[in-house]
Design a protein with these regions (language model features):
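Sec-dependent bacterial lipoprotein signal peptides
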Residues: 1-14
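Membrane engagement elements in two modes
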Residues: 9, 16-173, 177-185, 194-239
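Extended Gly/Ser/Thr-rich low-complexity repeat segments
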Residues: 187-189
């Protein structure tokens, strides 16, 4: 009976929502849906397109365990200026060469379809840890757009440590700092773990906001086996 009363009370409170509140909520939902629907628009232009003259793919890797799969693309900015919002289209294939995943999907998060920023001459290991493969991932290919030019810091300082690890992954916790005078929103922290030149684990976290001249906590899960590996963390600025 108590549970029923709680449920009724919740419904009653929900019914008190004003028309203005309902309108504002519907507007937020509509904007969010439009944002997600448009997320794959830049990728459509990359299908069958020649490689970018500004951003080069230096290598690709894929790791997978029973916990999931992650694709990693090593990219480099060959220009003398910072590039922002660089579209990236990836396709993951199995050992037989059949496509098992692509990030060119309506509704996918923008953080999984673009590189936030790359400093002049800089490089980054971009991670997609949401690979919903229909088969066993074996390889990944990538096509990049040119992005937009602009300024900003090369990278946001990141401090972190691995709090837990196993053969199936590891948990990384830390802080990302924003030394600029403007808040950074939707900051992606990329994490890759290597044994020498071999990628053995990867993951990422999205921080809603890092305040101006402040810092924010993050936690991410590594896919793969990070045991004894060298961990690299990068957080490109978003503005």
């Amino acid at each position: 009976m108590r549970l029923a009363l709680v449920a009724l009370a919740t419904l009653a409170l929900a019914g008190c929502e004003t028309t203005e509140e309902k309108s504002a909520q519907l507007e937020r939902v509509a904007k969010h849906s439009k944002h997600l629907a448009e997320a794959s628009e830049p990728l459509r232009a990359l299908v069958g397109a020649p490689p970018s003259s500004k951003v080069k793919v230096q290598g690709t890797s894929v790791v997978h365990t029973s916990e999931g799969a992650a694709a990693v693309v090593r990219v480099r900015n060959t220009t003398g200026t910072t590039l922002h919002r660089i579209p990236i289209l990836i396709e993951v294939k199995d050992a037989a060469g059949a496509s098992v995943y692509t990030n060119n999907q309506v509704g996918i998060s923008p953080s999984l379809t673009s590189v936030p920023s790359l400093p002049a001459g800089g490089s980054l290991e971009w991670v997609d840890d949401q690979v919903q493969a229909t088969g066993t991932p074996a390889s990944v290919s990538a096509t990049l757009g040119d992005g937009e030019t602009g300024g900003g810091p090369a990278s946001l300082p990141v401090k972190a440590s691995v709090s837990e690890q196993s053969a199936n992954g590891g948990t990384v916790e830390g802080t990302v700092t924003n030394p600029t005078g403007a808040a950074q929103s939707e900051v992606v922290v990329y994490a890759t773990a290597h044994h020498g030149s071999e990628l053995v684990a990867a993951g990422r976290a999205v921080v809603n906001e890092v305040p101006a001249s402040g810092s924010s906590h993050f936690q991410l899960f590594l896919i793969g086996d990070p045991s004894g590996a060298s961990l690299k963390l990068t957080a490109p600025p978003t503005s």
